[in-house]
Amino acid sequence: MKRFTLIIDGHNFFFRSLWSCFRQSSKTKILSTQKDIDAYEKKMMVDFCSVVKSVSPIVNDIVFIKDSHSWRKDLLLEHEYKGNRKKTQDNIDMLGFGEAVNNFTDTLVNFGIKVGQAERSEGDDLIYAWSNFLFESGKSSLILSTDKDLNQLIKCVNGIHIIQYSPVSNKLYVSKESNDIIKSISEHKEVQMENLFDELFTISIENDPFEKFVKGTDIEEVSPEEIRFAKIIGGDSSDNIHPVYFKRGDGETKSKGIGPKTVKKIYDTFKGKLGCEFDYHIYSNEDVMKMLCNIIYEIAKIKDDEFTKRMLLENIKTNTKLVALTDESIPADVIDNMVGNINEERLKKSVILSKITRENIFAKSRFKEYKSNIQFDSGTVRGAKGCDMDFIVG
């Protein structure tokens, strides 16, 4: 199997490193001192080296994705989109956080790592743009993130893969087609190999690095279109996106929405009536969307005089823009910005992965020298708490 380009979800990476260092406290604001900023920056460099080492046998290039101000926050009010995350951020000095992650990103640039960053582009958008560009160029991608929103990008066509790896759960998310190939490897079937100088594996199946990697992971087969559909219709509570039908409770009555089981019934019924291959293009077909509205009304048993099918259709359109990662759902200017970033960064030579060591990374940073003893002003904890981990997604 061909080697992958490793695409690292920077936002996800930043907060995994953060919560592996600091314990949330109502008394002490983290990253409010230079000592904490320095320590956090060093921790990210150490974690980056560890991440690369863990997947280096199966990758031959790296793209590190960094968020910018999201166009989605311009589409909805700031307090609505991802507004439920602000309480978690209250305990973080965001100026200190910004200084640390910017310094860390500068270190990656100094080292020659490709960095995906573009104006108005959220990390998910850039991961879509980069993985799609690589896919169309005949190159496979390994997305490193715990964010299940990115499952919608997973696919495999003609042996070109987009798969996702969660380092927290040690889980590999793959399409049915990718999983079939993995199963064939585990059954020790012949794998077509190409020239080693093209950085493809030409060795026996017993020594195949990919086989060794997947043997140490849990594999979950996912349906990208079903995941995208579920987030559009059922919303995404982690991003504060409501279902396409949602009525907030008034204290005496409970809030009403569309739960996962109902979304599944809607999906199965819609897929059965569609009569053609199910992909993201359907969301731009108004007649098909009207059919979907009728199915939602029927299965969700919506009886609300204040809620019309026209409102439902508009909610589907809005959620599609917020949730779906496609050229159709992302604004044209954002696409142009990301294409510009790709065209610039792809000209960089691939970094030799064996050179990504703590000593070499620190040498390119403002610290210049690696020291194993990293100290913090705030309390530290080895491994993040469950409540902390909720914030790293998205």
Where are these regions (language model features)?
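Noncatalytic, basic helical substrate-engagement surface that gates or grips nucleic-acid strands
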Residues: K2-L144, D149-D180, E187-K189, A324, ...
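Accessory alpha-helical DNA-binding modules that contact the DNA backbone or grooves
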Residues: Q192-D336, K348-D377, K385-F391
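Common nucleic-acid-contacting/processivity interface regions adjacent to the catalytic cores
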Residues: G394
